[in-house]
Amino acid sequence: MVIQRKYRASRRLGVNLWGRSKDPFNTRNYPPGQHGGMGYKKPSDFGKQFAAHKKFKFYYAINSKQMRNIFLKAYKKRGDTGDNFVGLLESRLSSVLYNSGLVPTIFSARQLISHKHVLVNGKTVNISSYVVKVGDVVTLKEKAKNLPAVVFAVQSQEQKVPDYLEVDTQEKSIRYLRVPKYCEVPYPATMEVNLVIEFYSR
């Protein structure tokens, strides 16, 4: 059900959000539902802002309250709000694990974390929103290294690993090298952080 909802989100937003080869949007590039075949309507300015906000929300698998809190933290920090916002999202444990390519989806990353299969600096962490710091090492526990989802993800190499992560596919370990800026994140779809800022600044 989670995977189905994820794919439905891609079709609703009109984009292959996670860049996966099996995303149904690749073959059914119209909205879901009874009238989906009529195609996508041209959105208003607010509609564009709302859609941009939804893309980030679905991509990182977070809820509206979490998203708003992350934005407020980014807004209060020094520096560029967009870079701060993306940096906070990318520093979440679930994001680091997903971006490493050791798991196939953000949802499988969250599941491994909640089932206590993930270590940060040798200690078990079961909270997806845990903030990984620069220099931290994330590893999978021994019993998780041969899980079908992990083996599939490593073999398929479908995920493009960003250069701010150092990944050892043999040891199933990840070192967080630095907090990325918005322009450094290899999003598979167009992600407009400026529209998210506008959405929350209304």
From Swiss-Prot:
GO cellular component, one term: small ribosomal subunit
Disulfide-linked positions: none
Domain S4 RNA-binding: 91-168
Keyword entries, A-Z: Ribonucleoprotein, Ribosomal protein, RNA-binding, rRNA-binding
Any one GO molecular-function label of the UniProt entry: rRNA binding
GO biological process terms held by the UniProt record: ribosomal small subunit biogenesis; translation
Annotated TM spans: none
InterPro entries membership: Ribosomal_uS4, Ribosomal_uS4_bac-type, Ribosomal_uS4_N, S4_RNA-bd, S4_RNA-bd_sf
Matches recorded under SMART domains: Ribosomal_S4, S4
Subunit structure: Part of the 30S ribosomal subunit. Contacts protein S5. The interaction surface between S4 and S5 is involved in control of translational fidelity.
Sequence similarity: Belongs to the universal ribosomal protein uS4 family.
Function summary: One of the primary rRNA binding proteins, it binds directly to 16S rRNA where it nucleates assembly of the body of the 30S subunit. With S5 and S12 plays an important role in translational accuracy.
Name the UniProt record assigns to this protein: Small ribosomal subunit protein uS4
Native organism taxonomy: Bacteria, Pseudomonadati, Pseudomonadota, Alphaproteobacteria, Rickettsiales
